[in-house]
Amino acid sequence: FFSMIPKIATGIASLVKNL
């Protein structure tokens, strides 16, 4: 589970950058 956190955080960060 914790191994997925970095991937999710990176995905959210990329979405925020696109905004």
From Swiss-Prot:
Predominant location: secreted
Keywords: Amidation, Amphibian defense peptide, Antibiotic, Antimicrobial, Cytolysis, Fungicide, Hemolysis, Immunity, Innate immunity, Pharmaceutical, Secreted
Gene Ontology cellular-component annotations: extracellular region
UniProt note on tissues of expression: Expressed by the skin glands.
Residues that bear Leucine amide: 19
Functional description taken from the UniProt entry: The amidated Phylloseptin-3.1TR has weak antimicrobial activity against Gram-negative bacterium E.coli ATCC 25922 (MIC=100 uM), Gram-positive bacterium S.epidermidis ATCC 12228 (MIC=12.5 uM) and against fungus C.albicans ATCC 24433 (MIC=25 uM). Has an anti-inflammatory effect, since it inhibits the production of the pro-inflammatory cytokines TNF-alpha, and induces the production of the anti-inflammatory cytokine IL-10. Has an activity of stimulation of insulin release, which may protect the species from being eaten by predators by causing fatal hypoglycemia.
Protein name from the UniProt record: Phylloseptin-3.1TR
Annotated source species: Phyllomedusa trinitatis (Trinidad leaf frog)
